[in-house]
Amino acid sequence: MKRYILIFLFLVVHLFGAELAVEKNFKESIIKSDAAQKPLMFIVSRHTCKYCVMLEKETLSQAEVIEKLNKDFVVYIAYVDDGDGFPEEFWRPGTPTIWFLNDNGEAMSEPIMGAIDKTNLLQVLDSVKTKFDEEKNLQQYNYTKSKL
């Protein structure tokens, strides 16, 4: 019986205790993205924005989303009402704005504007990860080919 209780407690802590790893500034997140060979999910947000709060509380807090982001992405959230810095080229009117950047800090696509639910975000994350990996493989192939 003790064993089942311990297993249950482990699962509860593991599933509900997971935290999203969020970088503290834009430049450091690009450096980490490059070092880890992972894409960067960069969110422009505000504490007073209804949809920003919804995105964080209802989507980014889901265990499956946290696990996927922590495993396959580097995450940075810039709060414009806190004065968090990021390049002007990524500013768009309206928040939240979700960007996916390659490990060189270049946009992989146009941003997602507004909140997104768990199911759709997980689909987007899979798509972005696949595209990132394909681009990395192509770069490696071109590099190898140029050495021949």
PLM feature spans:
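Sec-dependent N-terminal signal peptides
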Residues: 4-13
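Loop/turn elements at helix/coil->beta-strand transitions in domains of secreted/extracellular proteins
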Residues: 36-40, 71-78, 103-106, 122
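Local sequence-structure signature of Cys/Sec-based thiol-disulfide redox active-site neighborhoods
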Residues: 26-61
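Solvent-exposed loop/turn segments at secondary-structure junctions
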Residues: 46-50, 58-59, 80-84, 93, ...
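Extracellular/periplasmic catalytic domains that process cell-envelope and extracellular macromolecules
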Residues: 34-35, 67-70, 90-94
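Thiol-based oxidoreductase modules, predominantly thioredoxin-like and allied folds used
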Residues: 20-24, 62-84
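N-terminal leader/targeting and pre-domain segments
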Residues: 17-36, 129-148
